[in-house]
């Protein structure tokens, strides 16, 4: 049977891999399907034609990979099924329309590129109802990095979103669009999903760091195929905690680990006469956790997440600095969770009007956004802390925190 043939092939690969040369971990760029590990629930929801339309979360959490995987699994032109992935970073609604229509035109789904979103809507309805010669049983538009697009659409009363929604409603589950991004996707979700607008009709999904089980699988499964074993659950937990359960950072650590093992083999530090599994020494693994490039990459990813709202007065970064100042006043050991008025008090002390001019309600909304981005965690009483203690450490020492806050003080 096909299953038996596939099983034999997998077993053959599993037996041969420990004696070969491979690098399964890829920290940037395209991730091959066999390295798509975890996110099964999120993947199923996005593939569902009635599933979520808004996808948001911090950087390095795998939103783009999710959308690309959906495109890979759902794109079957031979079956009249199409799933297109678009990266529209920095594009406004006009540029996004040009990119989307251009791809559909190149694939023979539309004959002429529309000049407006309204024209695009009419063309899609004609396509999906069979008025063109091209038959389409399913069409998915997976639109990534949609933040600028959403800002642009907001200035036009969200007309492009209404057009996409109308196509979906018209098509009887044969059309779906997905908008993925960071800051603006979150803000639209918070402000409008519950209101009587187009966003009130759109479901959403928040992509968070990996669960422990998914993170373990991403780290250990490729290593096991290569014949390596990490014997201690304690060191596994230490590694995953250091990566903050970010898939991209787990891939980065795995890549560094494989490169280091290859170098050790070259130096004959491993006894090649032994048979797999080859047990990786705990000291060896912990040394890699202090690798300069690895630590720099962790901090870089954290800072990128904080700076997603650079066009919006650096609110996230400022709030994180104020939170770090609260920690520093307790010698890095907070005795309580902090509320918006605690953050405002720090801003008052340093004379930062960008924060003091905000109402407590708006400040809390921003802190909720930071919780959605996994920077903060919130307790039942409405208090906040850094989601991981390492986030506080990445803000720098007390002197750096104070200096940065002073830089934002009003002149």
Question: Where would I find each of the regions flagged by the language model?
Answer:
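Winged-helix-like regulatory helical subdomains adjacent to P-loop NTPase cores
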Residues: 31, 35-38, 232-233, 245, ...
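Short, amphipathic alpha-helical interaction segments positioned at domain boundaries
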Residues: 390-411
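Conserved Walker B catalytic segment
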Residues: 119-184, 189-195, 397-398
